[in-house]
């Protein structure tokens, strides 16, 4: 193999940086579906209840209350929506 052959192989193989630019940026479908589900009325209401209760609990200096129930309600509403939509988006 001569010097010319080596140079030809280097130019034909392409630059790895160019190949990376040509590839599409992959987007996680789970993230996309979660964002869509958070916009639904049921999730919006659950988030509003969570934020309202969080403000209530945070305003008190000494309290044993927490927002666990409201957090679980919000996550349940969002996950319920995601479960129905996610697999339709997979290839």
From Swiss-Prot:
Disulfide-bonded cysteines: 37-81
Keyword Transit peptide: yes
Stretch forming the transit peptide: 1-13
UniProt KW keywords: Acetylation, Disulfide bond, Electron transport, Membrane, Mitochondrion, Mitochondrion inner membrane, Respiratory chain, Transit peptide, Transport
Region listing for Disordered, in residue ranges: 1-30
Composition skew (Acidic residues), residue ranges: 14-27
Protein's job: May be a component of the ubiquinol-cytochrome c reductase complex (complex III or cytochrome b-c1 complex), which is part of the mitochondrial respiratory chain. This protein may mediate formation of the complex between cytochromes c and c1.
Family to which this protein belongs: Belongs to the UQCRH/QCR6 family.
Identification of the protein by name: Cytochrome b-c1 complex subunit 6-like, mitochondrial
